[in-house]
């Protein structure tokens, strides 16, 4: 029986040998192998997310049921609006099915809560495909709105995967994990700006923030983007230089 236990932060997990064997069979395994410890079963960052690739993907009807159930529970607590980043949250990671579910519920008047979607993608090609299919920040129905593109640039402090400029004191030589290279980030920010898409990037460590600030500064289309300011989510380990850089780039 495959078993996986995910840390509360979602950035590190551990699975048994049966789970590892299944994980090694997915097409994306070569991309995430460096984040998998085959001796201990420890998974980090992207490897944590791809475990869901071995689980059965829900149908659109099931996805719609999940959304309606969650909305009902939020309504019971008095909530009328919510933001979330659902597109990579379910087995199969079928963002098209999740978007179709929200749009169908909204069209039928069955969304009981206003939903603002942070469009989370783990791979640059998926983020670009989303935009190329016509989605843009600010597109809205009655209760569903397309929000910013959400990227995860590093991990968490608890998992020692937040990207730092200096090594962790209790983990010599470890400066965390970067999801996108500087070249990839530069390309994505230019693509977002050229196609009128806002970006919100998860950054816990100072190295991750430095990379996002650099990407924003390099974008040749930055002044053409009218969809709002790009943002850094969390900004946990920062300093005056980083804060000034955010101010300079209007983040």
Predicted regions and their residues:
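Conserved helix-loop functional segments at active or binding sites
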Residues: 191, 214-222
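Catalytic cores of alpha/beta
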Residues: 241-243
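Glycine-enriched alpha-helix->loop->beta-strand junction motifs that scaffold or abut catalytic
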Residues: 217-219, 245-251
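Divalent metal-binding segments
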Residues: 1-132, 151, 156-208, 229
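Non-cysteine beta-strand/loop elements that form the S-adenosyl-L-methionine
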Residues: 141-161, 249-251
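Aromatic- and carboxylate-enriched substrate-binding clefts and catalytic-loop regions
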Residues: 228-239
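Short helix-capping segments at alpha-helix termini
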Residues: 106-112, 138-139, 219-227
């Amino acid at each position: 029986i495959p078993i996986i236990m995910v840390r509360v932060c979602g950035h590190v997990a551990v699975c048994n040998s049966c789970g590892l064997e299944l994980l090694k069979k997915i097409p994306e395994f070569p991309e995430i192998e460096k984040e998998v410890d085959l001796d201990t079963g420890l998974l980090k960052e992207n490897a944590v997310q791809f475990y869901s690739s071995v689980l059965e993907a829900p149908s659109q009807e099931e996805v719609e049921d999940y959304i309606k159930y969650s909305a009902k529970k939020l309504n019971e607590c008095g909530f009328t609006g919510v933001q979330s980043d659902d597109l990579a949250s379910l087995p199969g990671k079928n963002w098209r099915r999740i978007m179709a579910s929200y749009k169908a519920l909204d069209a039928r008047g069955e969304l009981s809560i206003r939903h603002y979607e942070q469009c989370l993608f783990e791979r640059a090609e998926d983020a670009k495909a989303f935009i190329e299919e016509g989605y843009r920040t600010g597109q809205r129905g009655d209760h569903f709105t397309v929000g910013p593109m959400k990227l995860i640039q590093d991990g968490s402090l608890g998992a020692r995967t937040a990207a730092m400029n200096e090594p962790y004191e209790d983990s010599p030589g470890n400066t965390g994990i970067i999801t996108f290279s500087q070249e990839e980030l530069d390309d994505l920010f230019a693509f977002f700006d050229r196609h009128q898409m806002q970006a919100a990037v998860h950054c816990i460590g100072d190295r991750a923030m430095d990379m996002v600030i650099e990407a924003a500064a390099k974008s040749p289309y930055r002044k053409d983007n009218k969809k709002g300011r790009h943002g850094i989510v969390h900004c946990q380990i920062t300093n005056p230089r980083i804060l000034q850089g955010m101010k300079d780039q209007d983040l």
